[in-house]
From Swiss-Prot:
It is found in: Cytoplasm. InterPro entries: Ribosome_maturation_RimP, RimP_C_sf, RimP_N, RimP_N_sf. This is Ribosome maturation factor RimP. Required for maturation of 30S ribosomal subunits. SUPFAM superfamilies: YhbC-like, C-terminal domain, YhbC-like, N-terminal domain. It comes from the Bacteria. Keywords: Cytoplasm, Ribosome biogenesis. The keyword Cytoplasm applies. Pfam families: RimP_N. One of its GO terms (biological process) is ribosomal small subunit assembly. One of its GO terms (cellular component) is cytosol. Belongs to the RimP family.
Length: 143
């Protein structure tokens, strides 16, 4: 299977459904082999995100994708998980208020994302509150 890097078409097809339900699209991965299209979507909602809601979303999204795409579609929907690696600056906004492990130099430090901003975020530990630039983050993951 070949991974496809531009997922904007998939995003545009599903963003209205997720937005209405207060759900953030964290990540979309697409793979294609001949006439088969595999789509993996990671979604996040801060509260009341049940398995039943995931099942309903799967049905709604699959119907939208099958109506537009010319391939056989295989769809996986999941949540970020408790130890998700934060992969983009945009995710700091999505996970505001969440506890993270952050690596700036060579050590991890635990704290909370208080507020995400355009160029960085406010990180609160037990002893300090500091602005961290996204460009200084080596690794970050939910904790």
């Amino acid at each position: 299977m070949v991974k496809i890097s531009d997922n904007s078409e998939i995003y545009d097809l599903i963003k209205d459904v997720t937005y209405l339900l207060g759900i953030s699209i964290i990540e979309i991965n697409t793979f294609r082999r001949r006439d088969e299209f595999k789509i993996q979507i990671v979604l996040y909602k801060s509260d009341n995100f049940s398995v039943d809601m995931l099942c309903d979303l799967h049905k709604m999204i699959l119907l939208k994708l099958e109506a537009v795409l010319k391939y056989n579609v295989s769809l996986e929907i999941s949540t970020p998980g408790i130890n998700r690696k934060i992969k983009s600056d945009r995710e700091f906004k999505i996970f505001e208020g969440k506890k993270i492990k952050l690596m700036l130099n060579n050590d991890f430090e635990e704290g909370f994302i208080l507020r995400a901003e355009r160029d960085g975020f406010i990180f609160k530990t037990e002893y300090k509150e500091v602005k961290i630039l996204y460009s200084n983050v080596k690794k970050a993951k939910l904790s």
